[in-house]
């Protein structure tokens, strides 16, 4: 047991000895610190600027908050510059070529992200600086940065966004020459993407960058703009938003294939109406409340809601017409011509054979003429001279004429009632057939509206089949 303790103690002492710097490194650090001031700019001639290169290493696109117009990234800001006071000859210091010096002990540029949306503005982690023997200083602080971006939601979810990160010195003007470090980077990219983790919602198409000089209070400042061209992946929204909405609209169309008197189709259409309202509410949760434009998917859902609302109104009208009665509603001549003759022909509808009744006035006139002839016939027979042998028959006839006239009257009333019933039944069938015609017309009309509006909206979407940017980044 004692031997084990001694062995681990020896290993610990060796490790501690290795952690401590050597005499050469200690002497080198002492010589470099002598006469060094971290406030002083690292230039021999104060009239010349400090050349600082910035290389933006993008690791991950964490979040795109459309509602708050904020994008969150994990980046490494790699700054490089040369400090003439930090040069040494490696042969004089045990072949030491690099040093790791804590943050805050050397001069560093006051470069910030101007459009930062972080709570503390600068979210970079203070790491050590790496100094080479030729005076080159490497400072690469990692950080989770959030920056504001004006996101255009017009073509959501088939949208493309172009956002930028604006870097620049906060106080140094012409005294700091800020450059883009794009060495060994592919065309179209000014960000280093060798450690980039692809995002599940957006594709990163390009990362151009530009250098721009601005003047503020008679001082010229250099600013770097790193753009990000993002294209949204639409499979999620297509499968979970658009396809269900289209299926709901199609099921609403199928409601017009049900019998006109069926009230369940109104229940189906109201359910579909409320379902699309839920999808529209989901869009409102994503889009910013002060959006300058309406997202295309919101327009699609809004048009679907309008079409569904109109289909509900059409179904109510169809049911109302189907149950109309001739005693309460009279069909006009133009209505009869349009909905019973012209539209059925136009919609290729065939009506089973039916018997049309003659106008009532002609029937009554014929009945009156028929009734009058019968009465006159009886009267003529009553007053016509008859042979003597038929005297008894004449007496019988005279006694039965009133009864026959009463029977004829009852027959005329019964026939008129049958004619009225037939005419009423025919009128009821006309109203029902008119409801069927409007139902068929609604089927064709709303089918065309749904497919037409869907094709029209997505046909005008400029980013559906192209990767071209929607914002000019020059």
Curated annotation (Swiss-Prot):
The chain crosses the membrane at residues 238-258, 266-286, 303-323, 441-461. Residues 324-440 are cytoplasmic. One of its GO terms (cellular component) is postsynaptic membrane. Residues 22-237 are extracellular. PROSITE patterns: NEUROTR_ION_CHANNEL. SUPFAM superfamilies: Neurotransmitter-gated ion-channel transmembrane pore, Nicotinic receptor ligand binding domain-like. It comes from the Eukaryota. Disruption phenotype: Worms exhibit a lack of MC neurotransmission possibly explaining the observed reduction in pharyngeal pumping rate. Mutants show differences in their pharyngeal responses to nicotine. A variety of mutants show an increase in lifespan ranging from 29-57% longer than wild-type. Extended self-fertile reproductive span, fast body movement, and a longer pharyngeal pumping span. The strongest allele (ad1113) shows retarded growth. Animals generally have smaller nucleoli. Expressed in pharyngeal muscle. GO terms for molecular function: acetylcholine-gated monoatomic cation-selective channel activity; excitatory extracellular ligand-gated monoatomic ion channel activity; transmembrane signaling receptor activity; transmitter-gated monoatomic ion channel activity involved in regulation of postsynaptic membrane potential. It holds the Pfam family Neur_chan_LBD. One of its GO terms (biological process) is nematode pharyngeal pumping. Disulfide bonds join 149-163. Glycans are attached at residue 95. The keyword Secreted does not apply. It is found in: Postsynaptic cell membrane; Cell membrane. Residues 359-378 are annotated as: Disordered. Neuronal AChR seems to be composed of two different type of subunits: alpha and beta. This is Neuronal acetylcholine receptor subunit eat-2. It comes from Caenorhabditis elegans. The gene is eat-2.
């Amino acid at each position: 047991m004692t031997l084990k303790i001694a062995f681990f103690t020896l290993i610990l002492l060796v490790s501690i000895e290795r952690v401590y710097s050597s005499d050469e490194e200690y002497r080198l650090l002492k010589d470099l610190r002598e006469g060094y001031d971290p406030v002083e700019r690292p230039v021999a001639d104060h009239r010349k600027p400090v050349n600082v290169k910035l290389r933006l290493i993008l690791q991950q696109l964490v979040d795109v908050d459309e509602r708050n117009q904020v994008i969150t990234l994990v980046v490494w800001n790699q700054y490089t510059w040369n400090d003439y006071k930090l040069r040494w000859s490696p042969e004089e210091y045990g072949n030491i070529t690099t040093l790791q010096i804590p943050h805050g002990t050397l001069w560093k540029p006051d470069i910030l992200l101007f459009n930062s949306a972080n709570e503390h503005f600068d979210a970079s982690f203070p790491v050590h600086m790496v100094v080479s023997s030729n005076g080159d200083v490497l400072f690469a602080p990692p950080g989770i940065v959030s920056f504001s971006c004006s996101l255009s939601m017009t073509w959501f979810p088939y949208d493309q966004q172009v956002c930028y990160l604006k870097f620049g010195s906060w106080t140094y003007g012409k005294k700091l020459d800020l450059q883009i470090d794009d060495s060994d980077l592919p065309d179209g990219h000014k960000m280093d993407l060798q450690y980039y983790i692809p995002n599940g919602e957006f594709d990163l198409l390009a990362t151009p960058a530009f250098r721009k000089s601005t003047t503020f209070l008679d001082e010229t400042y250099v600013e770097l703009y790193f753009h990000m061209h993002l294209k949204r992946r639409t499979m999620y929204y297509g499968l979970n938003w658009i396809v269900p909405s289209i299926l709901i609209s199609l099921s609403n169309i199928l409601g017009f294939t049900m019998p006109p008197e069926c009230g369940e189709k109104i229940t189906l259409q109201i359910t579909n109406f409320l379902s699309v309202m839920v999808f529209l509410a989901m869009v409102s949760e994503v889009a910013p409340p002060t959006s300058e434009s309406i997202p295309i998917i919101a327009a699609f859902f809004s048009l679907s809601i309008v079409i569904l609302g109109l289909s509900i109104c059409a179904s109510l009208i169809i049911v109302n017409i189907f149950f109309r009665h001739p005693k309460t509603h009279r069909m006009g001549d133009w209505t009869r011509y349009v909905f019973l003759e012209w539209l059925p022909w136009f919609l290729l509808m065939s009506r089973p054979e039916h018997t049309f009744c003659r106008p009532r006035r002609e029937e009554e006139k014929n009945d009156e003429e028929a009734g009058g002839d019968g009465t006159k016939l009886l009267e003529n027979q009553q007053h016509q001279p008859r042979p003597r042998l038929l005297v008894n028959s004449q007496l019988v006839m005279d006694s039965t004429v009133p009864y026959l006239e009463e029977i004829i009257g009852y027959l005329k009333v019964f026939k008129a009632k049958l004619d009225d019933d037939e005419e009423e039944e025919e009128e009821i069938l006309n109203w029902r057939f008119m409801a069927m015609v409007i139902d068929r017309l609604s089927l064709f009309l709303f089918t065309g509206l749904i497919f037409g509006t869907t094709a029209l909206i997505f046909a005008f979407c400029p980013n559906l089949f192209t990767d071209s940017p929607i914002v000019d980044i020059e």
